[in-house]
Amino acid sequence: MKLKKTCIAITVAVGVISLSGCSTASALSGLLSDSPDVTAQVGAENTKQLAGVTAKADDKREVKVSDSNIGKIDSSVKKSVEVSTIQANTVNAESITVTKSGSWYDPVVCWILVFIVLLLFYFLIRKHEKKEA
């Protein structure tokens, strides 16, 4: 009887946790900023720009620019930039993608884990009831 009450309490607790949300990103949302990641495809590699530090090798390429009022161009392919906002008048790139952190598989994994825990408790209760009978 004591095991059954414990299993019911754990099942209710798991249900409350699963209904309140169990995203892996939500646990750190208070510590991290809510700004989206910005990815700009300019060359052969995507460069993520967000608030944080990443370590990448800096590979330089020679670029010749004509008819431009830009004095100096940093043409590195694997450049890591730390920014919190991006402001530009004109951006010329092959593609620019702005994404917000979070994915569809976090809730799916959470629900699968809840289902497995509920199945384990069900079989544990059945095994305990068979021993008592």
Curated annotation (Swiss-Prot):
Cytoplasmic membrane side: 126-133
Keywords: Cytolysis, Host cell inner membrane, Host cell lysis by virus, Host cell membrane, Host cell outer membrane, Host membrane, Lipoprotein, Membrane, Palmitate, Signal, Transmembrane, Transmembrane helix, Viral release from host cell
UniProt-reported outcome of changing C22S: Complete loss of lysis
PROSITE patterns, sorted: PROKAR_LIPOPROTEIN
Record-level GO BP terms: killing of cells of another organism
Segments on the Periplasmic face: 22-104
Domain of life: Viruses
Transmembrane segments: 105-125
Lipidated positions per record (S-diacylglycerol cysteine): C22
GO cellular component: host cell plasma membrane; membrane
Signal sequence extent: 1-21
Lipid-bearing positions (N-palmitoyl cysteine): C22
Protein name per UniProt: U-spanin
Protein species of origin: Escherichia phage T1 (Bacteriophage T1)
